[in-house]
Curated annotation (Swiss-Prot):
Residues 1-32 are annotated as: Disordered. This is Small ribosomal subunit protein bS20. The keyword Ribonucleoprotein applies. NCBIfam families: S20 (TIGR00029). Transmembrane segments: none annotated. One of its GO terms (molecular function) is structural constituent of ribosome. One of its GO terms (cellular component) is small ribosomal subunit. Belongs to the bacterial ribosomal protein bS20 family. One of its GO terms (biological process) is translation. Part of the 30S ribosomal subunit. Gene3D superfamilies: Ribosomal protein S20. It comes from the Bacteria.
Length: 106
């Protein structure tokens, strides 16, 4: 006698749909963070301090929001912010751009 096909668990299907939506949302947030970080570094290399610092602050804000919403772990967020600020500061110093008042003073 042929066996009946087992029914699918509805809650598992729903959780899967939710995870796919969450994955897309998290991917978009991480992509935006990477894009802004790269843009801030590029502007710092060009010596455009004001614009680089403005973009860096936006990236910092997105990183904090991602950590708040569990897209990024809080320690990973802190590490990314630290590395971004250090890189932007080094590039601006190398370009001879002023840093005081930009949130990167020593």
């Amino acid at each position: 006698m042929a066996q009946k096909k087992p029914k699918r668990n509805l809650s598992a299907l729903k959780r899967h749909r939710q995870s796919l939506k969450r994955r897309l949302r998290n991917k978009a947030k991480k992509s935006a963070i990477k894009t802004l970080s790269k843009k801030a570094i590029q502007l710092a290399q060009e010596g455009k301090a004001e614009e680089a610092l403005k973009i860096m602050r936006k990236a910092e804000s997105l990183i904090d929001k991602a950590a708040k919403g569990s897209t990024l772990h809080k320690n990973a967020a802190a590490r990314r912010k630290s590395r971004l600020m250090r890189k932007v500061r080094q590039l601006l110093e190398a370009a001879g751009a002023p840093l005081i008042g930009g949130g990167l003073s020593a």
